[in-house]
Each structure stands twice: as structure tokens, then as C-alpha cells.
A protein has these predicted regions:
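Conserved PDZ fold ligand-binding element
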Residues: 98-120, 194
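Alpha-helical transmembrane segments of multi-pass membrane proteins
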Residues: 34, 67, 71, 253-263
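Functional transmembrane alpha-helices
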Residues: 47, 51, 157-258, 275-287
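Conserved hydrophobic/aromatic pocket- or pore-lining residues that grip, position, or stack substrates
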Residues: 137, 194, 262, 266
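Internal alpha-helical transmembrane segments
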Residues: 20-23, 27-94
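Small-residue-rich helix-interface/hinge motifs
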Residues: 1-43, 261-269, 274-283
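PDZ-domain C-terminal substructure recognizer with occasional recognition of PDZ-binding tails
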Residues: 104, 110-111, 125-172
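Short helix-capping/hinge motifs at transmembrane helix termini and TM-loop junctions
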Residues: 74, 78-83, 210-211, 233, ...
Length: 287
């Protein structure tokens, strides 16, 4: 490894140990690992280009994979400390489709048009992307014993609300996070924090290619520094624990998005390198 860097942009600090330079750079997002022979042919047997193809695939894939692992670990911490946003209803709005279809407080939404719903954010994301679409809502209703769940289905067309200026199903949730019960739920919802952000990043990329999201909606390093600064200022009045958890939540979003972006099959990114390496596996020789 020629240089191992934390962050991007101009180098703020560095030191050399052995054959490797360790650097901290100006923008605290991501990082890089510059290896000998990564972009040019080297005769040194230690060089990247002289390693077996599966070793090179493992090295290139490690970056995005560890982005996802970091998001998973932060997700577990957040769920342990704050819980998760349950898709269980506390009520329905008068005159809206959910009430007309017989939904009520206590119902827990499980699917929207066959897309799984794990947390309430899944519902808000789906409504953001499909505001006027007729939706097959699958949900569970607790029976009298409080443990047995009855599976139900409703077909709902969102109704426009003059008050909010949006299309609504007419469902209400508490907005409060619910504690996870036991290790299984902590792992489930902790992992889903990262999965949700990965899913959102993939959908956002699709919207970008379809022209639904413009370049003005994208955030570069300078804007991200501004967002972090604003986030810290807004959460400081609620205590240091809230600041840390909010920054962790932001790190999950950044790490997941960076992992997804790096896997795009673009030559300058890890995904592009992986395409050429897998082609090398198929052909039996470098391209």
C-alpha cells in the first residue's frame, strides 16, 4: 500500500511508516487506499497487478463491503439506544381512504403493492415515489388475545389533502421510536437501518437517470460539511447523546450511499474495476 487516507481532498496531515504513507485529508468523507501497481504495470511481486485475480477482486470489493458493515454496526447502536419506527397505526383520519376501507388503530402495515414494510419510513418513501398510485395494502390486526395476528388486505387510492398539499392514505402513527425486544429484533432492525439507506440510494440513482432528480439535489463534500454543522447545532440543545445518535444516523446514510455509488459499473469506481476483473476471470487473461 503506497498511501492509506482517511477523508478526501487536500492532505492535512501525514506520516510514513514502513513503505506506507498514512494521511488525513480535508473532507471527512470516505477514504482511499492507493496500491502499487493499481493503475500501471509494476514488476514488483508485491504490486497489486501481480496478485491473483481473486485476490484483486477481494481487495476492490472490500471498500464497498466495509461501507455496508459500518452502516450495519451504527444501525445496531442506534436501535439499541433509540429503538425503531414501527409501522403500527395509532389511528386513521376521518374521511380518508384508510378509514373507509376499515383500517383502525393497532393495525400494522406489512406490505404496499407487494413491497415489504419493515419501518414506517418505508411507507413515507413509497408515498413519496408513488403519490397517486392505487395501493394494495397488506396489514395485520391483533385479535383479542393480543398475540395472534389476523392478516388483512385493503385496496386504497390516496386522497388529495388541501391542508397538507399532498396525497394521503389517512393513516396515523405516533412518530415515536419503539424499543427493540431482545437480540433478534436489535439485529433485525439494526441491519435494516443500513438496508433502508441502501434501498433509498438505489431508488435515488434510478430517479436521477430518469430525470426526476436534478444535480441541484445532489450534495457534494462542501454541502455535506454544511449539513453536518447544521445537524450538530440543531441537536446540541437535546444533549450529547442525541448529537452522537443523529451523526451516526447521518453516517449510515453516507456510508450506505458511498457503498452503492462505488459499486456502479463506471470505470473510475470500484464497480467498474470489478466488471473488468470478472471479465478477466471469464477470459482467463487480463483485458
Amino acid at each position: 500500500v503506497v498511501e492509506f487516507s482517511i477523508g478526501m481532498g487536500p492532505r492535512l496531515w501525514s506520516t510514513e511508516k514502513g513503505e506506507t504513507r498514512y494521511s488525513i485529508k480535508a473532507f471527512p468523507f470516505g477514504g482511499s487506499c492507493m496500491m502499487l501497481g493499481e493503475d500501471e504495470n509494476e514488476s514488483n511481486p508485491k504490486a497489486f497487478n501481480n496478485k491473483p485475480v481473486w485476490a484483486r477482486i477481494a481487495v476492490v470489493a472490500a471498500g464497498p463491503i466495509f461501507n455496508f458493515i459500518l452502516a450495519f454496526l451504527f444501525g445496531i447502536v442506534i436501535v439499541c439506544a433509540a429503538g425503531y419506527d414501527s409501522p403500527q397505526l395509532i389511528g386513521v383520519s376521518d374521511g380518508f381512504p384508510a378509514q373507509e376501507q376499515g383500517m383502525q388503530a393497532g393495525d400494522r402495515i406489512t406490505k404496499l403493492n407487494n413491497e415489504p414494510v419493515v419501518v414506517y419510513r418505508d411507507i413515507t418513501l413509497y408515498m413519496l415515489l408513488h403519490p397517486t398510485e392505487t395501493i394494495k395494502v397488506e396489514y395485520e390486526r391483533p385479535l383479542e388475545d393480543g398475540k395472534t395476528m389476523e392478516k388483512r388486505t385493503a385496496v386504497i387510492t390516496p386522497k388529495y389533502s388541501e391542508e397538507t398539499g399532498t396525497y394521503m392514505l389517512g393513516i396515523m402513527v405516533s412518530g415515536q421510536y419503539r424499543p427493540a425486544n431482545g437480540l433478534a429484533e436489535i439485529l433485525k432492525y439494526g441491519a435494516y437501518e443500513g438496508i433502508y439507506c441502501i434501498k433509498t440510494a438505489i431508488k435515488s440513482i434510478g430517479m436521477m437517470f430518469r430525470g426526476q432528480v436534478g444535480m441541484d439535489d445532489m450534495a457534494g463534500p462542501v454541502r455535506m460539511v454544511s449539513i453536518i454543522d447544521d445537524t450538530v447545532k440543531e441537536t446540541i440543545p437535546y444533549g450529547i447523546e442525541t448529537v452522537i445518535l443523529t451523526l451516526m444516523n447521518l453516517c449510515i446514510l453516507l456510508s450506505s450511499s458511498l457503498g452503492v455509488m462505488n459499486l456502479l459499473p463506471v470505470p473510475a469506481l470500484d464497480g467498474g474495476r470489478l466488471v473488468f476483473l470478472f471479465l478477466e476471470v471469464v477470459r482467463g487473461k487480463p483485458i
